Swiss-Prot record:
One Pfam family it belongs to: ParA
Subcellular location: Mitochondrion
Organism: Mus musculus
Protein name from the UniProt record: Iron-sulfur cluster transfer protein NUBPL
UniProt xrefs under Gene3D superfamilies: P-loop containing nucleotide triphosphate hydrolases
Main localization (coarse): mitochondrion
Residue range covered by the transit peptide: 1-38
Length: 319
């Protein structure tokens, strides 16, 4: 990286202000003049770096009333992350009826929780002017989808998205929750970083299909959480196998055990396998998640097992 480019990045461009980048006088080619400029640039660069480093990372602040935060993430879209988040929340409650569970949708551009949890309407405000989550199937839910029209696209820049995330994190009255499941957007961008740096997260669950292209991005997602000191609880291998409803023959449409190979590479465990099954898709589209509507099915049992593994790892993780 050249000197002038470094100065533009660290010295001249800042959301919080700062001096403009120094530009050498036109036609100035004298060696002494150049050395003076380089010396000035070097000193300005050092000062700017010191200013940036002194700010540090945002101080993490727990969400009031929430004991454990579990984020459900994926490296890419279309792997069943939101379906996993919804059914994980329901499974956590089903496995232990004494536990209060919430579900937070921070996928601002593509919120899925309202549809999957069969919820509509706007949140009411508490006396403290905080939004109250909408409730269904015993799960308290909050999503940007409750605040905008279902078909209205959000054409927002990054700062507006970050402001919305801040409101979803800090301006919701959750009451007392044992578990808050957070449905992340796909990828490893601003939202993931902002959430990870602003609230204490008990653990991350990475969702992937067994195919190589999805596993590549899942690898990146797991590494990102490790870099921001978020414990990765394990991987969920979604759409692991398809069983023909007539002949019962099993086919690994997306490949076999790809997530297990990745888990070995990352020194992680696979929390469970979820089959590719029509009932999961139909139940989600109807707003009746399979853990609620078909609790005795093999599909629901897969999510119940995953929830048990998540809780076991939370209990064994250091405080």
């Amino acid at each position: 990286m050249g000197t002038w480019r470094r100065l533009l990045l660290f010295g001249g461009v800042s959301l919080r202000g700062g001096g403009a980048a120094t530009v050498p006088p036109r036609g100035c080619r004298a060696l002494g003049c150049g050395r003076q400029l380089l010396g000035a640039e070097s000193e300005a660069l050092k000062q700017r770096r010191t200013q940036i480093m002194s700010r540090g990372l945002p101080k993490q602040k727990p969400i009031e009333g929430v004991r454990e935060v579990i984020v459900v993430a994926s490296g890419k879209g279309g792997v069943g992350k939101s379906t996993t988040a919804v059914n994980l929340a329901l499974a956590l409650a089903a496995n232990d009826s004494s536990k209060a569970v919430g579900l937070l949708d921070v996928d601002v551009y593509g919120p899925s929780i309202p549809k999957m949890m069969n919820l509509r309407g706007n949140p009411e405000l508490s006396p403290n002017n905080l939004m109250r989550p909408l409730l269904n199937y015993g799960i308290a839910c909050m999503s940007m989808g409750f605040l905008v029209e279902e078909t209205a696209p959000l054409v927002w820049r990054g700062l507006m998205v970050m402001s919305a995330i801040e409101k979803l994190l800090r301006q919701v009255d959750w009451g007392q929750l044992d578990y808050l499941v957070v449905d992340m957007p796909p990828g490893t961008g601003d939202v993931q970083l902002s959430v990870s740096q602003n609230i204490p997260i008990s653990g991350a669950v990475i969702v992937s299909t067994p195919q190589d292209i999805a596993l590549m991005d899942a690898h990146k997602g797991a590494e990102m959480f490790r870099k921001v000191n978020v414990p990765v609880l394990g991987l969920v291998q979604n759409m692991s196998v398809f069983q023909c409803p007539k002949c019962k023959h099993k086919t690994h449409i997306f490949g076999a055990d790809g997530a297990r190979k990745l888990a070995q590479t990352l020194d992680l465990d696979v929390l469970g396998d979820v089959p590719l099954h029509l009932s999961i898709r139909e139940a989600s589209d109807m707003g009746q998640p399979v853990v609620f509507s078909q609790p005795g099915s093999d599909e629901a049992k897969a999510y119940l097992h995953i929830a048990s593994e998540v809780v076991r790892r939370l209990k064994s993780s250091p405080e």
